């Protein structure tokens, strides 16, 4: 039998396990959906829409809830002659300034590319460079006024713009400041909890009229979400009973993200399917889930290490040594002391402490280390620990630094590894 054939022993419809699959109902978000619907209700009354700010980690249903509710809102609006609702949707990935957001909004209006966007224009798209910000904002306001009625501007992943938040202040105020007839409301969606805290006070006053937190899913909620998908995705009796609970538990302990849980279940199914093609076994087991978790974490470390210098690898190796001895989370000062010994043992010269701190921050941003805020009688300080399994980190490091059996033996002695 060739490598490519349609024979499947376990997976009936893999697309059901993908992020972009849309179930008939959004599970485990009834409270948030009710709160969100209340915030959007002025639109149906023909009133000025609220500005709504959604926040929560990635994969907890913010964008899916927005799509579901706005599609329902658009259908309801069609029943009323005095409600003319249009939606403009923009994913702000790659937009690091208010200027870029404004240009992309203009071009979304003139050449819509997102599912929710309902407007179109015969005007030519604008170049992303070469204009003053005021000119771009005026072009945007003119386009919005030409659309008229009620306009909801959805800015997904708005935290990408960082501190350059002019657009979030100006856009909600455009109607009152420029005497526009169009009723404009902004829906901002952020994956970064700190983004809201760092907004300027004037932006908070305008954008955050209605705030809705989407908390991480707990293990029971993730189990229900996964089971709903699994019932469709797999053949009968293709999953052992502890597979879905284990996927949910792993993901709940980490991020509480349904996206992460689905990825884990999908990977476990792939591993089991590959085995089934050779030995005929036709079930996903807890061992497949554990192997999938290990492979995903290892790949996460490998991808993060692509941006690391050799010194960055030594910093990670240092934290691995400490983790093997159950000495983490550990303070930056003590990590640096151990790092100096690690570097000398590899025949190199250590960096200054400031640069090592930068490497620790980079590893934290890549999800390889976790920053732990701690305090004592002398004030606050930072501690770091692994945010992936020690085994995954060592596997990835060995591909760059060679055999690390001594650390594995230490970890076994301390019962960190089996």
At which residue positions do the language-model features occur?
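Conserved catalytic segments around the Walker B and adjacent sensor/switch elements
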Residues: 53, 76-94
